[in-house]
């Protein structure tokens, strides 16, 4: 049966969490948008020239009252534009971006108010803290943060950074789920390491009412992890350049896309792990999450046991990212410098381009 069955529009607000496979899910929805729409499932975009992922990112920024990740003002009007497209659709509509998770109560109230008349569902994917904390630190460094792993973890333990506001399942879902039937609040657990590659997507399909055959095109978008040495080099580069967190689009393509998500991933390097000293804390936090989930009556897709943080495997050792040897960092830095040099050689000289344009214009004037 088509997901569009029934007269009422269903809007699924997929709000995160960050680092839980959201990039993959968004890209797969986008790649299969046409075939999904034929079955009444819509992942709206503004124009064919603007990807759905970028459209939803700008809409989320606008709803949150933020302006970063692009030219000044690039998100202005984004939320209203998305809402207009939602209201033109019937059946199932998906809105997705992970920066929505830590939204203020005012922003959440506006989202619900603007989507009034639709059956609103909240979708939140959760991952065990043993994998989530290292991934969150790496992501913050990719976005320009300069803090050490130790400082990041210290702040996490006190619940202060934006990332943990987005990761603390009870806090997020109490805010977004207020006034919504618990049966319409969906927790999707991220499968453990070694699970079938397609399992997370199958869980999303179950939540969204998608027959997997409606979305045959797979995505190769995966936000791959950096090793300890690679993350440390990016962090020091941020500090040396005094890079502003998340805001400098001019650096984004070079540092984030080319280095942190391109040149420096897939290297043979020690992975970033959660320190063993935080194991008991992570287990206590997880128990708090599980108790909240069971008491709240929200819908769970997946296995709650997936959320339990596993200790380091036997024979596996923790490598402190803050104490990586200079020799290891030098190798990474040389590879990064080589990549930057190749990129600089590939790009045209803007001064030479300007000179050519001036000469061309002068020639036209003489003629």
What is each PLM-predicted segment?
Residues 1-367:
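Anion-recognition interface
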